[in-house]
């Protein structure tokens, strides 16, 4: 199965992040990659939750402060002692080779250059070792889709630890694939190998659909899996896919070192609440005991600001990364982050928040 996609390496002119989707759709469909674009863009069932993720940011307004002597904005922050130049990070996204020939390698390089954080998926088009080798010791996280086979889990995690990752992301909201009609219509099957899978079993995922890939995942995840991963790796474990305050409390009690508030960009359960809707309640019960990462629906610097003001410590983006990757490779991904950083900086100064801590003290109405 041959697959050819973008190999462009260039800065991308961006007016707003949402406009990138149409540009990428046109390019990928012209290349005969309609199914791949549908996989990247699509959401579950009626895509209500996917749309609500972005729309929900308009349910809150920023209460700006003035006359505070703020002539610049400081975006720097940190997590687990890792210093970052921006609170915006890349969400782990599978199969980035669908968007660009260099896939995760270009994304990892971009994250290093903008001072952000790269996370690689179990289902990446690049191995965890190759992604780590692409950068000069820049911090990376590994996203684990836990398998039914603990030998496979330990094998993968050992690879990740040897590659120098700084934390493990346990994906809790994706024990099977959401019903995405676009994938069904396009008869989408993965055209590129997934090296992390192939290294253990020889089965690289080529020619398989989403449901076949997820069939090997552990459907019956339990809280004790958190400690199991910590014992295997001696690394912090972030639980990704938390949408309920009780789950957040139970995950922390079970040893979680971080909470990732996410509904997988509306790709899994349709009809569930927007991530931004549930964030304040989760932040309240977490009460700063562990860091909170937030994603789903972020398309503006204003959205980043509102998520931080609602209790998030970092804000992740998924689809926009792949759109930038398709349009310009490493430089395209950098363009996405530079644009969002610019919007966030403007919002901060106009709202009267000089740094990330000041954003957290800002009232939303």
Residue ranges of predicted features:
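An N-cap/entry alpha-helix motif that binds or orients negatively charged groups
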Residues: 2-81, 180, 188-221, 357-359
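Short beta->alpha linker loops
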Residues: 44-45, 122-126, 148, 243, ...
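Glycine-rich active-site/cofactor-binding loop and its immediate structural neighborhood
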Residues: 84-126
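A gly/proline- and charged-residue-enriched helix-loop-helix capping module
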Residues: 113-153
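Charged C-terminal helix
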Residues: 342-365
């Amino acid at each position: 199965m041959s697959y050819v996609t973008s190999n462009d390496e260039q800065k991308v002119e961006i007016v707003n992040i949402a406009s990138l989707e149409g540009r990428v759709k046109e390019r990928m469909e012209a290349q005969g990659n309609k199914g791949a674009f549908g996989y990247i863009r699509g959401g579950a069932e009626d895509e209500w939750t996917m749309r609500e993720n972005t729309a929900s940011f308009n349910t809150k307004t920023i209460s700006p402060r003035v006359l505070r002597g703020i002539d610049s904005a400081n975006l720097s922050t940190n997590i687990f002692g890792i210093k970052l130049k921006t609170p915006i990070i890349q969400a782990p996204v599978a199969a980035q080779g669908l968007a660009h020939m260099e896939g995760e390698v270009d994304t990892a390089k971009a994250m290093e250059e903008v001072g952000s954080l790269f996370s690689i998926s179990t289902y990446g088009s690049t191995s965890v070792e190759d992604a780590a080798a692409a950068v000069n010791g820049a911090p990376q996280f590994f996203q684990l889709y836990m398998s039914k086979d603990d030998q496979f889990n330990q094998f993968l995690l050992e690879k990740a630890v040897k590659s120098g990752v700084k934390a493990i992301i346990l994906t809790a909201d994706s024990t099977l694939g959401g019903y995405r009609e676009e994938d069904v219509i396009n008869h989408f099957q993965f055209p590129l190998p997934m090296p992390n899978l192939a290294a253990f079993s020889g089965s690289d995922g080529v020619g398989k659909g989403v449901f076949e890939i997820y069939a090997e995942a552990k459907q019956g995840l339990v809280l004790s899996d958190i400690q199991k991963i910590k014992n295997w790796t001696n690394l912090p474990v972030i639980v990704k896919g938390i949408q309920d305050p009780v789950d957040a409390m139970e995950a922390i009690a079970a040893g979680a070192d971080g909470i990732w508030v996410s509904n997988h960009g509306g790709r899994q359960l349709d009809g569930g609440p927007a991530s931004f809707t549930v964030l304040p309640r989760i932040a309240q019960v977490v009460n700063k005991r562990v860091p909170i990462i937030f994603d789903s629906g972020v398309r503006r610097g204003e959205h980043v600001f509102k998520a931080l003001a609602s209790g998030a410590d970092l804000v992740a983006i998924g689809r926009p990364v792949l759109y930038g990757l398709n349009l310009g490779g490493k430089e395209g991904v950098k363009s996405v982050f530079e644009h969002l950083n610019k919007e966030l900086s403007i919002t901060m100064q106009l709202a009267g928040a000089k740094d990330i801590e000041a954003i957290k003290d800002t009232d939303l109405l």
